[in-house]
């Protein structure tokens, strides 16, 4: 499925009954969050607030509020099909040369997809139909949501931040929230290991005293938005991966004020710079943990230009205790992670990040165990292989007879196959999300691995338990007469 832009995607959603237009005036201050939260928890549609109180620009919320809409945005008809996206990423991360002519034919579709990776730069674009600069720059024209009562200020949540480090051809796209400070200033909240922060750090080292160009695109096409939250290899641009998802080259246009490329079909683009040493205290904000986070200092983004479509809409979301939109996206992207991990660790059968664990703080892994100590190797692999799992605090490893996505199965394995002292690994002073106030020091905390697999010789001196299982012939006989027994036909069937 190909979408030319966000509006093309919205047209499809509306056709499928997955978009609700709200004409009643709704306030961006708290009311939109409450409506979007109730809708998401009920598995409801994307929401287009057509008449935000005090504004003429519509607000789009809850766009990726179900895993199915995430899959549609990535060009797939089902969540299960996202495994194919993961296989493509695994191939791009570590491409294998064909072993022969037949293997070359098998890999041909993957090589053909690579043709969509280069971007196509346009001379003019819809995102630059209107240009505001200088004193005319005013974020007050945009209905930026104030999500929670204790939030410090309105917050831009769905901005695709475009950066490029010195001597790099690849542009980085990342989604970092931005607190509004004034009509032309926001705080750029990015963590130190994220691509934008690394680009800025390298820039300040090589260009001391010079301004760092930045652009923020709002309302890009779904492939570009989702590419920015997908674990693409560090050497691959999110624009290139968006082209793979879309099946056509990503169309970009040069910024009005700098050499950065932005999505040509974006609804709104903020252009400007970061000044070395100019920082501000960000927060507090209600976050994906379900709590207000601590305040901290981050760079200030000064906006020199705002470009937009003539009839632009503003794409927004909120974060809160799961489920929220990031948690739903994490649930869908879980399917992308599995093939990537399996490429490195073929023994992995399934991998699950429960939404209740903030989508990254706890992982359950099932494996085909092959030797004593195998579970501990997998724990270390999860923590080290992908940057996305740097902050995963708990990893539970089970055998492949356990359903990683069924807590009844997992808890049974933990309580029958684990000895707390022998089967628990604790590591201190490891990187932790600074938003995790449970850690003793900001940015540093511990991790726990739990080996809930059956123990092999060398891991235990005791005779291991044999699972109970009914005789197969007996089960077959009872299957044959089960309906005739009619035991559960009086309202007791579960």
UniProtKB/Swiss-Prot annotation:
Q: Which residues form the active site?
A: 287 (proton donor)
Name the keywords, alphabetized.
Answer: Cell membrane, Decarboxylase, Flavoprotein, FMN, Lyase, Manganese, Membrane, Metal-binding, Ubiquinone biosynthesis
Cite the binding residues for Mn(2+).
172, 238
User: Catalysed reaction(s)?
Assistant: a 4-hydroxy-3-(all-trans-polyprenyl)benzoate + H(+) = a 2-(all-trans-polyprenyl)phenol + CO2
* Cofactor note (record): Binds 1 prenylated FMN per subunit.
Q: Name one GO molecular function term.
A: 3-octaprenyl-4-hydroxybenzoate carboxy-lyase activity
User: Record's SUPFAM superfamilies?
Assistant: FMN-binding split barrel, UbiD C-terminal domain-like
Q: Where in the cell is it found?
A: Cell membrane
Q: Which GO terms describe its cellular component?
A: cytosol; plasma membrane
Signal peptide (UniProt feature, chain positions): none
User: How does the record say this protein sits in the membrane?
Assistant: Peripheral membrane protein
The coenzyme or cofactor needed here is:
prenylated FMN; Mn(2+)
Q: Which residues bind prenylated FMN?
A: 175-177, 189-191, 194-195
Q: How does it assemble?
A: Homohexamer.
Q: What does this protein do?
A: Catalyzes the decarboxylation of 3-octaprenyl-4-hydroxy benzoate to 2-octaprenylphenol, an intermediate step in ubiquinone biosynthesis.
HAMAP family linked to this entry? UbiD
What protein family is recorded? Belongs to the UbiD family.
* Protein name as it appears in the record: 3-octaprenyl-4-hydroxybenzoate carboxy-lyase
Annotated gene: ubiD
